[in-house]
Regions:
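Residues marking helix boundaries in flexible regions
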Residues: 8-9, 273
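Intrinsic disorder/low-complexity segments
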Residues: 1, 13, 270-272
Length: 276
């Protein structure tokens, strides 16, 4: 597997994150330095209004850019075959048409975008079981269903230098250039979901597992693995810092385990055959 690194929405400030240093990160052979990106002023940010249509178009452009600048695995690879086995029968989730892909990068990460694109890093697939991978997928789809991803995309656009280059003084959003999409990727990499959003996404991931007849403990196991990884990571690493800044992660792990336990201790256990 190629040692590529990529910037994506910070999907877990508790769920999944990279163990590698972003200083090594390159896109298309070029290092991205957000400090060199021109920032528009506060007044310009307030002046921009983004519609749902703008966000949808932006999400599509963003995913096309991400798939171009990251090594998307082919169907005949081990990762491609495993992905097909896990997601081949999932075409739509709660009205959202979804498509899946694997980036052959070593990051332990995954994310979903507002256009229904779900991308999983090979690094995450390497350390997790099939059910755990799907729990993470359910969590990420939950962020989209709850509009967390759409809000993150909007906020990243407003915070990034994209707004300056794309016309901060204009009331409309123009098609984004390659450099502007790179700047947005930087902004999305620094995005963080609230604890409430993460907990709700955990719940969605849990229900996703139940609906698809997967291990009810998969969400707990996935979260617990990530928590253990953070404990093993170097003290000053980005991975460790991310988890240390979210002390409630351990509570999320415990909560996920409790939900799975309750499924079996309830007087009328739920049928986990996939019907609801």
């Amino acid at each position: 597997m190629k040692k590529n690194f990529f910037i994506i929405t910070a999907v877990v400030c508790g769920m999944s994150c990279t163990t590698t240093a972003y200083a090594q990160f390159k896109i298309g052979g070029k290092k991205i330095n957000v400090n060199k990106v021109v920032q528009a002023g506060t007044d310009a940010v307030k002046a921009i209004s983004l519609s749902d249509a703008d966000i949808a178009a932006m999400s599509k452009e963003y995913m096309e850019w991400m798939d171009t600048h990251n090594p998307l695995t082919k169907p005949d690879t081990d990762y491609g075959k495993r992905l097909e086995k896990l997601t081949g029968n999932i075409k739509e989730v709660d009205g959202l048409k979804v498509n899946f892909g694997v980036y052959e990068v070593i990051d332990v990460n995954a994310f979903a975008c507002g256009d229904g694109s779900v991308r999983i890093c090979a690094g995450l697939m390497d350390i997790m079981t099939d059910d755990e991978v799907m729990a993470v997928v359910g969590h990420e789809i939950g962020h989209v269903i709850h509009t967390d991803s759409k809000d993150a995309m909007k906020n990243a656009y407003l915070r990034s230098a994209v707004k300056n280059a794309a016309g901060a003084a204009s009331s409309t959003v123009s098609k984004l250039s390659d450099s502007e999409l790179g700047a947005m990727a930087e902004a999305l990499a620094g995005a963080q979901y609230s604890q409430k959003q993460e907990t709700e996404a955990d719940d969605y991931g849990f229900e996703f597992c139940i609906k698809n007849n997967l291990d009810p403990y998969a969400m707990y196991n996935a979260l617990n693995k990530l928590l253990e990884l953070s404990a093993e990571a170097p003290k000053e690493s980005k991975f460790q810092k991310m988890f240390s800044s979210h002390p409630d992660t351990a509570k999320r792990v415990a909560r996920a385990k409790e939900k799975a336990c309750l499924l079996y201790t309830s007087p009328s256990p739920r049928d986990i055959s996939g019907s609801r």
